[in-house]
């Protein structure tokens, strides 16, 4: 069968780009400085998208325990605040989050997120049980919002080093925000926690190359010029969704 010479060639789909730590920092600086996004605004966008991803991966009807309990473990910097926002939205979606936030940030914008959770009567744990079975029995899953891409994975201090030891042993699923805690953002981990779900923010990081679990991307807010400049090749999000499963 002859094909006409003006028949369109199939479009080449460029592969999704995985960013290095340095590129992540550069993109975020550009968003804040040149595009006038606020840091609190970005944290809210990301936290809300994380909550949506969790509802997709673990719908209320799929949870094994009678109560839809979740444990959100928050670190001291931006990832921790994203965890706080995620917990607040999950509460609105009728889950029952509990937060463990051992070193609260002194920055006003992070404190705002803490107050919002407290005002919604989301409980805060005073300590993380080291007896893993207590966590397995009490919660359906753990949300790891401890350490972000900027963290030096070789220099994780207490209490976070001890928390990672505990989380490595839990039997319930772990959902990691952006970068699984304890991983180097630039390369897949040889040792570290093993999340069942990863939610990449803005664009996936190099460490997520070959990630075998369920992988979501929350990045449907990036100005097109930034997407083009960094050749991110983001996938087409379905409908009006703010997340996509990769």
From Swiss-Prot:
Phenotype seen when the gene is deleted: Morpholino knockdowns have a reduced number of nascent hematopoietic stem cells in the ventral dorsal aorta between 28 and 60 hours post-fertilization (hpf). Morpholino knockdowns show increased levels of free (unesterified) cholesterol.
GO cellular component assignments: mitochondrion
UniProt xrefs under InterPro entries: YjeF_N_dom, YjeF_N_dom_sf, YJEFN_prot_NAXE-like
Residue intervals of the YjeF N-terminal domain: 24-234
GO biological process, one term: sprouting angiogenesis
Domain of life: Eukaryota
UniProt keyword list: Lipid transport, Transport
Annotated Pfam families: YjeF_N (PF03853)
A GO term for molecular function: NAD(P)HX epimerase activity
Subunit structure: Interacts with apoa1a. Binds to high-density lipoprotein.
Function as written in the Swiss-Prot or TrEMBL entry: Accelerates cholesterol efflux from endothelial cells to high-density lipoprotein (HDL) and thereby regulates angiogenesis. Orchestrates hematopoietic stem and progenitor cell emergence from the hemogenic endothelium, a type of specialized endothelium manifesting hematopoietic potential. YJEFN3-mediated cholesterol efflux activates endothelial SREBF2, the master transcription factor for cholesterol biosynthesis, which in turn transactivates NOTCH and promotes hematopoietic stem and progenitor cell emergence.
PANTHER family associated with the record: NAD(P)H-HYDRATE EPIMERASE, YJEF N-TERMINAL DOMAIN-CONTAINING PROTEIN 3
Protein's name in the database: YjeF N-terminal domain-containing 3
Organism this protein belongs to: Danio rerio (Zebrafish)
């Amino acid at each position: 069968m002859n094909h006409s010479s003006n028949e369109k060639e199939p479009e080449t789909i460029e592969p999704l780009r995985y960013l290095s730590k340095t590129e992540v920092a550069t993109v975020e600086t550009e968003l804040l400085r040149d595009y006038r996004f606020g840091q609190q605004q970005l944290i809210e966008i990301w936290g809300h998208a994380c909550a949506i991803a969790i509802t997709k991966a673990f719908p209320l009807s799929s949870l094994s325990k009678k109560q839809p309990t979740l444990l959100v473990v928050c670190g001291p910097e931006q990832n921790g605040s994203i965890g706080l926002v995620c917990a607040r939205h999950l509460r609105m979606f009728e889950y029952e989050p509990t937060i463990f936030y051992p070193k609260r940030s002194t920055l006003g914008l992070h404190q705002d997120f803490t107050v919002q959770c407290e005002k919604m009567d989301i409980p805060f744990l005073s300590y993380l049980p080291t007896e893993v079975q207590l966590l397995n029995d009490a919660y359906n899953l753990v949300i790891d919002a401890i350490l972000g891409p900027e963290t030096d994975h070789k220099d994780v201090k207490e209490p976070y080093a001890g928390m990672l030891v505990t989380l490595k042993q839990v039997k319930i699923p772990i959902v990691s925000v952006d970068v699984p805690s304890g991983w180097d953002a630039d390369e897949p981990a040889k040792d570290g926690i093993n999340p069942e779900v990863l939610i990449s923010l803005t664009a996936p990081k190099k460490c997520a190359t070959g990630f075998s679990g369920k992988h979501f991307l929350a990045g449907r807010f990036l100005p097109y010029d930034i997407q083009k400049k960094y050749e991110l090749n983001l996938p087409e999000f379905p409908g009006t969704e703010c997340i996509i499963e990769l």
